[in-house]
Amino acid sequence: MKIAVIGQSLFGQEVYCQLRKEGHEVVGVFTIPDKDGKADPLGLEAEKDGVPVFKFPRWRARGQALPEVVAKYQALGAELNVLPFCSQFIPMEVINAPRHGSIIYHPSLLPRHRGASAINWTLIHGDKKGGFTIFWADDGLDTGDLLLQKECEVLPDDTVSTLYNRFLFPEGIKGMVQAVRLIAEGTAPRCPQSEEGATYEGIQKKETAKINWDQPAEAIHNWIRGNDKVPGAWTEACGQKLTFFNSTLNTSGLSTQGEALPIPGAHRPGVVTKAGLILFGNDDRMLLVKNIQLEDGKMMPASQFFKGSASSDLELTEAELATAEAVRSSWMRILPNVPEVEDSTDFFKSGAASVDVVRLVEEVKELCDGLELENEDVYMATTFRGFIQLLVRKLRGEDDESECVINYVEKAVNKLTLQMPYQLFIGGEFVDAEGSKTYNTINPTDGSVICQVSLAQVSDVDKAVAAAKEAFENGLWGKINARDRGRLLYRLADVMEQHQEELATIEALDAGAVYTLALKTHVGMSIQTFRYFAGWCDKIQGATIPINQARPNRNLTLTKKEPVGVCGIVIPWNYPLMMLSWKTAACLAAGNTVVIKPAQVTPLTALKFAELTLKAGIPKGVVNILPGSGSLVGQRLSDHPDVRKIGFTGSTEVGKHIMKSCALSNVKKVSLELGGKSPLIIFADCDLNKAVQMGMSSVFFNKGENCIAAGRLFVEESIHNQFVQKVVEEVEKMKIGNPLERDTNHGPQNHEAHLRKLVEYCQRGVKEGATLVCGGNQVPRPGFFFQPTVFTDVEDHMYIAKEESFGPIMIISRFADGDVDAVLSRANATEFGLASGVFTRDINKALYVSDKLQAGTVFINTYNKTDVAAPFGGFKQSGFGKDLGEAALNEYLRIKTVTFEY
C-alpha cells in the first residue's frame, strides 16, 4: 500500500522503518518542525531514504484546513494514513482522504482513558491491566472504531517510563505493523467503541500534579508513579516545592528510624531514612520514595535530603569547567536528537543505548588523559550534572568509597599497620548491631582480646536481607550485563591481591593461621577463586532442546539459567577467607546477592573483605556481612522468607538443622559441606618417602583444622612400623610457635573450646586402648597450642576411629598385606564421604580403589591438592552440592524452560 506516516518521535521512526521492511511504499512523512535546529527522528530517517518530508507548523487556521497543506498531502496519493504518535491536530479533510482512511495508536485500552495523558491515568487509577489500542480515526476524541488491542499486566511499581519501555513501545510498534497488514489483507475489523466504562481525563500538567494527602497510601503511590517523570507529583514542604519520583509500596522490613519531614496536609510527617523518604497515607500504610527533585531542578536520593548531596555541591575549577563543556559536546554528538544538553538531561532517556555507553567511556578517556571510567559509572550517574560530578571526583582522585565511613581497630603487627573494620556491613555501610551489642574476638596465639566486634541480632539479619533483595531486584547489580559483572569480580580479585599481606596477617592474628601458609592458601586461593569465577560470568548459558512439534505448527524450547536471588552463606572458622571466597565467588558470578555469616570466632577477614568490595566498586547491598551466633544469625537466614538459597560449611549436626529449617520456611535451595572422616590408604608398593610427606600434610596441614584432613590412615602391615617411625621423626622436626614467624610450621588451634575438645579426644583414645606414640596434650605455653599427635593400634570400634578430631591428630590402623577389598570395606564403613586418598605405584590398584571409595574426592599419590577448577563436595552425611569448578555455579542458579510455538 501507499502510506502517509503522520507523527513524530522514536516510536514514529520505528513504525516507519518496519512498514518499509514490510514492503509498503511510504509516499510521504509529515512531522513537526525542527526545534533549535534539531530534526525529529522520524523526519531524519525518512530524509535518509529520500522519502518526501513535510514539516508543517500547523494544518489549519481559524478552524479551517489550510488549502495549500491539503493540496500537498493529496498530491501524494496515499491509500492509508498511519498516525503512530501525533501531537498536531489533523483536519478531517486529510483523515478521510485515503481509500482506507486513517489509523491511530493510543496508549490505553479504549474506551478507558481517552485523552492525551492516557498512560499517566492508567497508573493513577491503579489499573491492573494496561495496553494500547489502534483505532480508526473519526471526528471525535479517541472515539473511533477499534481495529486492534493488546494488553499487559501493570506491575505494582510501574511508572510511565517502565510501562512504556517494557510494553507500549516495543509491542506498540508490532501492533501498528500488524494493523497495517490486516488492512492490506482486507481483514481489518471495525468494532464500535462502547460508551460503557468510557473515561476521559485531561492532560496532566505540573500545576495539576500536586499530591492530595487525604487518601490511602496506595492512592498516593499511584499518583506519584502516574506522574513519574513528567510532569512530576509534587508537594510543598520545607518552604519549597518538592517533586517525588520512584515510589514503591514494598516496605517490608523497612526501618522508620530517621529524621521527620513535616508535610502540610499529610496525615503524618514523612521520615527521611537510609532507604529513602517514607510517606504515610490516611490509612497509616507506608510508601517509600527514593528520589526527590528540589525546586531548582536538582535531583537527589531522598535519603540525602537533609544531608544535601556532596557530589552535587562540588565547586568546579576553571579547568574542570572546561572539561565539563568538552564532555557536554561529547554528549551532543552521541545524542543527536537532543536540542541541548542541560544539567538535567538524562543519557538513557535521551535515546542512548549500551553501545553509546562504550562510546562515552572512550571519548572521556581521550578528553581526560586516559582516565579509565567503567560502563557502570555511566549507569550510576545518568544525568549530565551527575555524570560531571562523578567525573570530577574521579579526576580529583576521590573514590566513592570515601563516602562510606569506616571505623577501624588499628594494630601494628607483622611490620604492618593493620586497619580492621569491626562493625556489621549492611547495604554498603559499616553499622553497629541493634542495641550496639558487641563481643570479644580472641588472638589464639596468646589468648588476648584483639578487639570488640559488633554482634548481629535478628533485626540486623532482616535489614541485611532487605538490602540484598533491593540490590538484586532494583539495583545496578541486576541491570549490568554479565561481562561487566565479571570485570567487577576481576577487579575485586586485584584489590584482594593488593591487600594480600594484610589479609594473611589478619588470618594469623584472628584464626592462628601460619602466615606463610595463609599467604599461599587462605588468601592466595581466595584470590584465584574470584578470578576463576569472574571468567565464568559471561559463559553461563542454557540450551536449545528439540521437542515434539505441535503440527502443523512448530515448536522451539530453550532453557535459561538465572540467579536464584538473595543467598545466605554460613562459613566455618578454619579457613575464614577461603571458605567465604569459595562460596561467595560462585554466588556473585551467577548474579545473586549475598548475606554472609562468618564464624563468630573469626570475623575479621570477612569484615576486611567487606571493605575491599567497596574499593572494588561492588554495588551497595550486593555483599552484606554479619558476625554473630549461629543460633541467631544462621537460624534467621535459614528461616527468612526472602532468602532463596543457603550455602553452609560446618558440622553435620548443624547442617541437618539448617536443612530442616530451609525446608520448613520456604523450601530453600541448600548446599551442605559437612563433617568428614576421610580415609587414606597407604599400600606397601608406594613411594614411602612421598607417602610420609603427604601423610603428614594430610593430617597436620593448617593444624589439622582442615575439612578434608585424613581422619584415618590405613597402612599396609609390611610397611606399618617403618611408616610410623618416619612420621614421628618428621613430627619432631616441626616448629611450634608464633604463626607470624616465617619458620613456624605449626600454629595455635583456632580457639580455646576447640583445644579442650582435642585434649578430651586424645584422652578417650588412650582410655579405649589406642597407642599414643607422641603428642596428645596442650603445649605448655600461652595460647591455644596443641601438640602434633600420632596414635597407632587403632581398632575399628574405637571412638577415635569413627569420629572426626578436626585437629593435628594422626590415627593409624594396620591392614593385612594384599587385602585390598577388606581395607576398602573398613575405609567405607563410615557415614562420612568428603575425601579420601590412596598411595600405590600400581595404577590398576589405584583406579580400582578410587572406583570403590565412597567419597566426593579421591587423591591418588597426593593429598590436599584442591584447585579452583575442580569440584569439591562430599557424599553421605558429608553433605551435598559442590564448591569450586563449573559445578559450583549450578548451586546458585535456577533453570527456566521457555517454549515457543510458531
From Swiss-Prot:
It comes from Rattus norvegicus. InterPro entries: 10_FTHF_DH, ACP-like_sf, Ald_DH/histidinol_DH, Ald_DH_C, Ald_DH_CS_CYS, Ald_DH_CS_GLU, Ald_DH_N, Aldehyde_DH_dom. This is Cytosolic 10-formyltetrahydrofolate dehydrogenase. One of its GO terms (molecular function) is protein-containing complex binding. GO terms for biological process: 10-formyltetrahydrofolate catabolic process; folic acid metabolic process; NADPH regeneration; one-carbon metabolic process; tetrahydrofolate biosynthetic process. Residues 318-395 form the Carrier domain. NADP(+) binds at residues 571-573, 597-600, 630-635, 650-651, 673-674, 757, 804-806. (6R)-10-formyltetrahydrofolate binds at residues 88-90, 142. Coiled coil: none annotated. The keyword Transcription does not apply. The modification N6-acetyllysine is found at residue 882. The active site is at residues 106, 673, 707. The N-terminal hydrolase domain has an NADP-independent formyltetrahydrofolate hydrolase activity, releasing formate and tetrahydrofolate. The modification N6-succinyllysine is found at residues 38, 660, 767. It is found in: Cytoplasm, Cytosol. The record marks 142 as: Essential for catalytic activity. Its EC number is 1.5.1.6. Cytosolic 10-formyltetrahydrofolate dehydrogenase that catalyzes the NADP(+)-dependent conversion of 10-formyltetrahydrofolate to tetrahydrofolate and carbon dioxide. May also have an NADP(+)-dependent aldehyde dehydrogenase activity towards formaldehyde, acetaldehyde, propionaldehyde, and benzaldehyde. The gene is Aldh1l1. It is an enzyme of class 1 (oxidoreductase). SUPFAM superfamilies: ACP-like (SSF47336), ALDH-like (SSF53720), FMT C-terminal domain-like (SSF50486), Formyltransferase (SSF53328). The modification O-(pantetheine 4'-phosphoryl)serine is found at residue 354. Phosphopantetheinylation at Ser-354 by AASDHPPT is required for the formyltetrahydrofolate dehydrogenase activity. GO terms for cellular component: cytosol; protein-containing complex.
